[in-house]
Amino acid sequence: MPAGRQLAFVQPVPRHLVHRASVAEVFVTDAVAGEGDRFLVAAQWPRDHALYHPDGSGCADPLLFAETIRQTLVFLAHEYYGVPLGYRFVGRDMDFEFTERSVLKVGAVPLPVVLEVSWAWADHRPPQRYGMRIEAVLTVGGVPCGRGSLRVVAVDEKRYGLLRRRAGRPASPVPPVSPVSPVSPAGAASPDGLPPGGAVSPGGAGGVVSPVSSGGAGRGVGAGRLAAQRVGRLRAKDSVLRPGGRAGEWDLELDLGHAILFDHPTDHVPLMVLLEGFRQLGYLQTSEGGAAVPHTLAGASVACLAFAELDVPVRLVMTQHRAPADAGGPVLLRVEAVQRGVLLSTASMSWTAERGVPVAAPGSA
């Protein structure tokens, strides 16, 4: 770290540099370049958040770490490596885990965290295609407490159009999130963070798909979705799961009007929306069926294989549920996201019990 240069937690970085429309959803506050391709990145996690709220034991929501990793890569790409604004970021894989959750307790002030980041180029063919990967160690108060990684490619409009056509969809016009106006022109969409899949994006041809249920025509948004408490959320609108047509299957409930999951218009299902679906299904599986205490997400590894469209049902299928090998051990889950028979994404998750927190009965206040 350069002499005399300390990380600042005073204000968020410009929102367009992390592909967010709302300033309130920007967690990264600063970055300092070190030797080689190494950085220290500062972020501030809120004491509370409508979607990413503390768990029953008072620790910060695990997906705050995932979103901070995403924002970190996008910010470094634009600010330090010259990836042009307006390029489409396509997610390949993400993983994260926690090694010491005690330091993640939410206190009387927002939680300052630091990511020790290493950057590497991968599958890199600039200037049309930038392939990049970051590895990050999460620290709080100087204590390492987690690690994670993210790999993406960023492509120009021509190559993005080719990727979309391979997926059977034309690329819709999606200008970058503006640093000036928080509202896109009528009929236009703004790029979200990182789409899932080896090439993933939009739902409708040439524009933004209207908010509809992933369950198909004839259903309103929210119809039949699981109660928020059953999936570990506080608000009804934050539940993204509906029972599927067969045992072990659930439908992803998409509400494009959700102010956090769909921070701005998009033409595909974003990675963070899929991750939220995986997380909620994991909570449901580990906290019901006789569990003595609720569980929290201790780690996840997500592989992105194909674009998830907005106007076709996305089904989440539980393919593995492995009980702890010993008392206090993690529950291991594997989930697949499927659309029209195409495997979109897979997630392997590790869940650990929240000590001293009893499970509430489904539907109780």
Model-derived segments and spans:
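One face of beta-strands
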Residues: 65, 92-94, 134, 276-280, ...
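Acidic/His-leaning functional-site neighborhoods
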Residues: 239-306, 310-313, 334-336
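Ordered, small/hydrophobic-rich secondary-structure cores
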Residues: 57, 65-121
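Hydrophobic residues on conserved beta-strands that form the core of alpha/beta folds
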Residues: 28-29, 91-93, 147, 297-299, ...
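Hydrophobic beta-sheet segments that form the core/acyl-binding groove
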Residues: 94-141, 297-343
